Amino acid sequence: MTVKQSEASRLGPIFDVCRDDGRAALIGYLPTGYPDVTTSVHAMVALVESGCDIVEVGVPYSDPGMDGPTIVKATEAALHGGVRVRDTLAAVEAISAAGGHAVVMTYWNPVLRYGIDAFARDLASAGGYGLITPDLIPDEAGQWLAASEEHRLDRIFLVAPSSTPQRLAMTVEASRGFVYAASTMGVTGARDVVSNAAPELVGRVKEISDIPVGVGLGVRSGEQAAQIGGYADGVIVGSALVSALGDGGLTALRALTEELAAGVRQRAAAS
């Protein structure tokens, strides 16, 4: 079975531009509200200015079962600071105003509490391109699929090395924009060695679809970004950016983002 990427994808043209440049897209994640709401928004704009093609705007959640310790600590701080979903939507607006491309990454419970259609409507109004839902599977996403069609939003589901062929095909078919490939089993976090399972997982998706594949869960350096950019359409970085922001503020965040952006372009120069 071959699954054709939907022409209605909002993110598709961004991946097309990167592909024309001979490189992967750089996708950076930060949680809203860390270390505080205002700084987090400035940080996301800094990602755009420093070379991120797509910014993942995180909605802090009290039970982040798939996040590593760095992101858990940051989201706990954001929640203690009183962050709200509306702050995430404001961050999306700021990214859009800066010429960037924002998707929201959230566990499903905050969307249910907000209201699925209302969230989709407000995300689209803020200039968002789509939603990454790590704990939502396509079988249980009927209302979200309908809302994403109504409001022209991309829907990014996760696949993992453990995904069966049937599960992989179902997830890819339900996705639009890109598929999020978990390069290691378990929770997220920066690692010194990127999982060998990632190229195989990307290859499995490519066998059945032309949808772009983003690989995350471990990148921390420009060298790793170049490595992953050799086989993936998108290089996703989260924990390392959160650490840079927490340890060195906007200056360190910009420096790491520029290194990562150079990394995906190194791959282009080598190809």
From Swiss-Prot:
SUPFAM superfamilies: Ribulose-phoshate binding barrel. The keyword Coiled coil does not apply. GO terms for cellular component: cytosol. GO terms for molecular function: tryptophan synthase activity. It catalyses: (1S,2R)-1-C-(indol-3-yl)glycerol 3-phosphate + L-serine = D-glyceraldehyde 3-phosphate + L-tryptophan + H2O. Keywords: Amino-acid biosynthesis, Aromatic amino acid biosynthesis, Lyase, Tryptophan biosynthesis. Pfam families: Trp_syntA. This is Tryptophan synthase alpha chain. The gene is trpA.
